[in-house]
Amino acid sequence: MTRTTVEPIKYEAPSWEHKSVHVSDDHRRIIPNVGDDATRPKGRIRRSMTACNTCRKLKTRCDLDPRGHACRRCLSLRIDCQLPETSERFQDSTPMWSDATTAIPSIEERLTSLERSMREMTGMLRQILNQSPSVSNISVPPLARSVHTEETASIEGNSFGPFLPKPVRLIQDLQSEFFGETNRIPVESPFLGNSFEKGILDSKLSLKLVQLFVDNFGPLVSINNQSDFHNEMRNTDSLLYSTACLLASRYVPGIPPPIVHTMNLQVRHKAVNLLWEKPPLKYESLQALALLCLWPAAGQKEFPIDGWLLSGTAINHALVSFDFLNHVPSELLIDNDIAAQLRLWNAFCLTQLHFAVGNARPFHLPQRYLDYCPRLLEHPAATVEDGKVVAEIQLYLITLRLQANEQRMRFAEVEYEEIERWKVEWAHLLGKVKQRGPSRINANYSTAGDENSTFELSLWFCQILLHRTAMRFQAESERLTSEILQGSRLIISKFLQLRFVTALRVVDQAYFIVGYAALNLCDFNFLDPLIDQIQMFLLHLSPNEDHIAYRFSCMIAEFKRRCAECNDPCSAVDGSQCSFGDARKMSMEQVQFVPPLVDSMIGGYSALEQLIPEVMPHSFPESVISGMAVTEAIPVGSAPY
């Protein structure tokens, strides 16, 4: 038999293996091109090379989750699963979500990632808002610069925010402890509703209250005479009318306290309803909100209005109503109507800053909207008071930025370069100046530098806050203590020079400044005679026991008593530090005010100077006057107001 030589068979890969193969979106199945089934040899199955070494040796199926790191057999045997390093394996092991082999990030890393994402989203939203269609065809470099730059006025909380002084919160907490304010506004009142609106205040009294409002409060909201009070504003349903009567009632102590209390409740309820209205709001509604922002603590029987929240909501309404969102400050033509709008806008910005500083809360208004504030001074009818408001806005912004700079606060400077530059820029409002030519200032308002101005109080107040913040890092600094004492004495001495009529119309922020200055004196030197003087001044000033001046007077007296007990080791009495004694029983009914009846005759409501009586010290409980070195009453008008 003939043996034939058999040539070795050369293996040739079938043509179907060279054709393109597509991987599905889930990276799990290999799908050939359409039409490959016709050319693919029968019986040949292309196996994936993803089995581990153990399964290949045992010739068993390797059940491997593409997202896993070991097959089921190796997991059950508790041995290392050695997977082949192939390109397919590499593709299968890169899913969209993090696989099991990736370490779980720490909480700090996740928070950092979230914060970074939030900052990116905020920047995108600001860019979208600033790319409004109405200004897309205009060159707006100021607008572009104000987005997320160092010049932005959005001041976040800082690392030592909880340690910042909170003068407004401190005073409100002391009042709550002393007077025990209710936690909510009563829903019903015996005079609240239509019966009150239809004539609890007779027409003659209403006219007098409106005139008092125009003379003392109106110019701050562009109401300079009664003709500016339109007929629709005089409706009893109007929040502006109710607010005007409430503010002016302090000049008429003859109005019974229940009526004043009901007026306060009515204003609160109307304000709540107004804030829920669909924007844009009417101009007179924004005027009323501006008044409530400037005097949020006018009535003190209930918990005070949160000026920070109210002014923030009012700012949002004003942005829509004044159409500031679709324009830049440089576009405005300052006519009379725009000037009136800017005056309200400045009031909203200033009160937001007041309570941001006073409560150590953030301020988030971008610089592009703050650029509207100084535009008011370009109007020919701008007053000195308008200039003071703009200057105060800049001052409080400087204070917020300095407080947010921990390094500057640790350095504990006595004089800050930013404050000094501000003083130079606004020196004409800080010192006495002579008017040249015809004055444009309302006769009822003070000129720069006279004894009725409270503008300097804000400067000393901001300096005290900066020194108090620095004392968090240098608690034993005698230099800072001396500066705080000096600033507090300047504030009280300046306020004591005010006439009663002027002191009653100052904004509530001035009372918080004076109260905080008195608390600082009690803290460092409770024997300072200015404490008793300001306490009695506020007591004489208050038209009723619900007024802010009366509450602050009682608070100062009680705080001084506590400080004296803390410094006197011989007067240690159990519970003395948390007891107010008989001070809560104080009532202004003990003072002989005018008869508490609403007289229908207009002559029954005389001027304030004729209605404030001489208050004798024995008219008040011992807990209030025990800490005061008062030997005789201070008659009204005897002090140099």
UniProtKB/Swiss-Prot annotation:
InterPro entries: prtT, Zn2-C6_fun-type_DNA-bd_sf, Zn2Cys6_DnaBD. It comes from the Eukaryota. Residues 52-81 bind DNA. It is found in: Nucleus. GO terms for molecular function: DNA-binding transcription factor activity, RNA polymerase II-specific; transcription cis-regulatory region binding; zinc ion binding. GO terms for biological process: positive regulation of DNA-templated transcription; regulation of protein catabolic process. The keyword Transmembrane helix does not apply. Its main location: nucleus. Keywords: DNA-binding, Metal-binding, Nucleus, Transcription, Transcription regulation, Zinc. GO terms for cellular component: nucleus. The keyword Transcription regulation applies. Belongs to the prtT family. This is Transcriptional activator of proteases prtT.
